[in-house]
Regions:
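Hydrophobic/small/kink-forming positions within alpha-helical transmembrane segments
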Residues: 33-41, 68, 91-99, 121-126, ...
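Transmembrane alpha-helices of multi-pass small-molecule transport proteins
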Residues: 2-12, 24-25, 49-96, 175-178, ...
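Helix-helix packing/entry segments at the starts of transmembrane helices
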Residues: 114-119, 186-202, 238-269
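Transmembrane alpha-helical segments that form core, pore/gating elements
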Residues: 44, 52, 67, 160-219, ...
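Hydrophobic transmembrane alpha-helices of multi-pass small-molecule transport proteins
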Residues: 139-156, 279-298
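Loop-to-transmembrane-helix transition segments
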Residues: 24-32, 71, 76-100, 164-172, ...
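Structural signature of hydrophobic alpha-helical transmembrane segments
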Residues: 51-63, 102-120, 162-175, 220-235, ...
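C-terminal transmembrane-helix exit sites in multi-pass transporters
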Residues: 120-142, 262-281
Length: 312
């Protein structure tokens, strides 16, 4: 989300990565988060002169170009799927979450929006429990509850501290979480490249529909330069995150995603002069701490299940 804090598709990481690969995976993930924060900053800058939908569409071009190259190399077999409806649904959710986030950051400081977007993993945990019937222990439920408290501290609803558009980030997080749940279904049946292709094609198609009604020709200058740079940066960020999960365990590199808040704060200050206030930092610290703890508990539970399976 910010625009996306996870890869565009479910990727099954190496089962037994070498120690050096774990370090490389962390480096890839850190690089991806650095670029994602840069892309979010570019998007916020562009919304000052262009319609948010046009900005999201322009960002999508990088991923779409990559898919066209993939289709040229491997042919239409890339689009072979066992569940087209779910693939289309996932593409729609991806477009929705990205659009809502970009609209939100046109009003809300980048660091605040990124902090709130990290509520998505907690929503994924809840959906996993209620939709996928995944067992969730009491400690993870407590972590989820505390994480939501942290989100409320950042937003402070009814106090007029943050622009109401921050609620769009919450809706974007819900869309993102739903997308991740769909990804879990698709991971067992479709290839990663298939999911990436459908996400890019469906998302681009949806975002193109309103384009004739909101299109604005950018004036020559910084806006054009940023438009040209944003799409390749977004595509490279996606690639780095995917490579990270290919060469290392997801549980090793996932906490690095929270560095997005650091980069978002840095860019927000350097470009827009925005700095989070004291309570935003407190809320963000709570969200990140409980998020990392949730990842730790998932790792413990996964190891326990593997041990039980091997003993059986």
């Amino acid at each position: 989300m910010g625009v996306s804090i996870e890869p565009a598709s479910p990727v099954i990481p190496s089962k037994d990565p070498r120690p050096l690969q774990s370090g490389l995976g962390i480096a890839y993930m850190a690089g991806g988060m650095f670029l994602f924060a840069a892309v979010d900053t570019m998007a916020k800058f562009l919304t000052e002169t262009l319609h948010p939908l046009q900005v999201v569409w322009s960002r999508q071009l990088g991923l779409l170009l990559g898919v066209f190259i993939l289709l040229a190399i491997k042919g239409t077999s890339v689009l072979a799927t066992k569940n087209k409806k779910l693939q289309i649904t996932r593409g729609g959710l991806a477009a929705c979450s990205a659009t809502l986030f970009i609209v939100a950051v046109s009003y809300v400081p980048l660091a605040d929006a990124v902090a709130v977007s990290f509520v998505a993993p907690f929503i994924v945990t809840m959906l996993g429990a209620f939709v996928l019937r995944e067992p969730v222990g009491i400690r993870r439920w407590i972590a989820v509850t505390i994480g939501f408290v942290g989100t409320l501290i950042v937003i402070r609803p009814g106090m007029g501290v943050i622009h109401p558009a921050v609620m769009l980030v919450l809706v974007a997080a819900i869309c993102f979480a739903l997308r991740q749940v769909v990804s879990r279904y698709l991971a067992g049946s479709d290839r990663t490249e298939t999911t990436v292709a459908y996400t890019a094609l469906v998302g681009s198609f949806i975002l193109t529909i309103p384009l004739p009604f909101i299109w604005q020709w950018p004036t020559p200058g910084p806006v054009v330069v940023v438009l040209l740079v944003m799409a390749p940066c977004a595509a490279l960020a996606e690639l780095l995150v995917i490579k990270s999960l290919e060469v290392s365990q997801a549980v090793v590199v996932a906490p690095v995603q929270y560095s997005l808040l650091i980069w978002g704060t840095m860019y927000g200050y350097l470009v827009f002069g925005h700095l989070p206030d004291f309570w935003t930092w407190i809320g963000a610290l709570i969200i990140v701490s409980t998020g990392v703890y949730t990842l730790h508990r998932e790792r413990v539970v996964t190891r326990r299940r593997k041990a039980e399976t091997q003993d059986a």
